[in-house]
Amino acid sequence: MAENNTSNIGFEKQIWDAACVLRGNIDASEYKSVVLGLIFLKYISDRFEAKYKELVEEGDGFEEDQDEYTAENIFFVPENARWSAIAAAAHTPEIGTVIDDAMRSIEKENKRLKDILPKNFARPELDKRRLGEVVDLFTNIQMIEHGNSKDILGRTYEYCLSKFAEQEGKLAGEFYTPSCVVRTLVEVLQPFNGRVYDPCCGSGGMFVQSAKFIENHGGNINKISVFGQDSNPTTWKMAQMNLAIRGIEADLGKFNADTFFNDCHPQLKADFIMANPPFNLSGWGADKLVDDVRWQYGTPPAGNANFAWLQHMIWHLAPNGRIGMVLANGSLSSQSGGEGEIRKNIINADLVDCIVAMPTQLFYTQIPVSLWFLAKNKKQKGKTLFIDARKLGTMVTRKLRELTDEDIKKIADTYNAFVDGTLEDEKGFCAVVTTQDIAKQDYILTPGRYVGIEEQEDDGGPFEVKMGRLTSELSELFTKSHELEAQIKERLGAIGFEI
């Protein structure tokens, strides 16, 4: 049976349920940083305490030596920031201040975390009694007992991000891309080594999945260099924490910044670029960037930043670089604001490698999306692969769909066969199309135009027999319809309404 991405959730849900009692009246973004910050603090304290105990038992007096912890990618936790100190203050009015001070102490001892951790636990809006109750609950949960890998907090962190996304609906796009979508991008691009870049990195999901991919395939995570940025200060800090506990070294800029106006990596030429930019962003400042060097294929319209994001990424590509990104479906066919001409120029430059039409309801928005894969040095020159994946996926809630592992593999395998030159078109699912044929379709990139309609199996029965059966069934339906019509008229007449 296909396994989806919400399987095996137990410990993560336990943490989430415990944290939910904090909701109260505080702002959603503040609540998010409080919950994720508390999870972060508990986990790094657990890891530190385990190593501390081990060093004490060795008896060499190295338990306060920071190098002993750094060598194993464990953050050094000062005495006032250890969970035992937090737990002791759980039922005091000062619990918020104690946690804030703990965060400051951790930042001071671990330069990588400077100005990253949330320090808003003392704010009046946060109910200190409830905060103390959550501390008690966390005290009874030993996170490292659920696994000794840094991935444990990562899973919890990712689960909580998905729950926040569920709560915030369409507003969640700024910090969260569904993991099955990210995994699809990663499985197609296969970023084993080189420079990986996300110009709108949210909470860092693209980087996390890249690291997982490398580890799952026996690669070396140190062979990739991670670069990114995000304009939202809260989201930027979430990404820093997310990557820190995964042990992923990253350059996300010195502060949060607008990618179009303050590119943190102006000289970067990346080998892999993965992104889920804000859908159809308007008011992005186009009038101030009219002659920008990045607009090699045409100036993007002021009312929609889709092709600004796309061209920004193309500008940052290395000579053999590749892009995997999420875009709203309108970008496949739009002719407004010069978008059609930009798309035409990008296609004629032989940059479009593959387009995947994705199923609906993968995101917390009704906007249909596609995956764009572009390459500076395509293996299949003058050809583009179209995949119509709209029928893939499984509903995991009434509103949300996920791609299964098998779905993701099917897309990745199809792409790999295309690159190898062994792919055969499959009606209704995939087709390899020349640039000339795309031009004949006015440079529209909607996969449905090219893959055709799925072939229906013929049961082999004679036409006359089928028609006889179908007309008989239709006659029965007509008879039932007349009977129902008569009953309705009779009941309406009984209450004084004649038809």
Question: Which residue stretches match the model-derived regions?
Answer:
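Conserved Class I SAM-dependent methyltransferase catalytic core
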Residues: 14, 21, 30-43, 236, ...
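Hydrophobic alpha-helical scaffolding
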Residues: 124, 146, 200, 228-232, ...
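Non-catalytic, mostly N-terminal accessory regions of nucleic-acid modification and defense proteins
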Residues: 1-192, 251-264, 357-360, 381-390, ...
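C-terminal, active-site-flanking charged/polar segments
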Residues: 348-352, 361-413
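A generic secondary-structure signal for well-formed alpha-helical elements
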Residues: 42-55, 164, 214, 218, ...
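Conserved S-adenosyl-L-methionine
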Residues: 171-275, 280-296, 327-330, 338-352, ...
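Short, contiguous acidic/charged loop-to-helix segments that flank catalytic cores in large enzymes
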Residues: 25, 284-304, 330-339, 358-364, ...
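Active-site lining segments that contact anionic ligands and/or coordinate catalytic metals
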Residues: 269-270, 304-306, 320-322, 326-328, ...
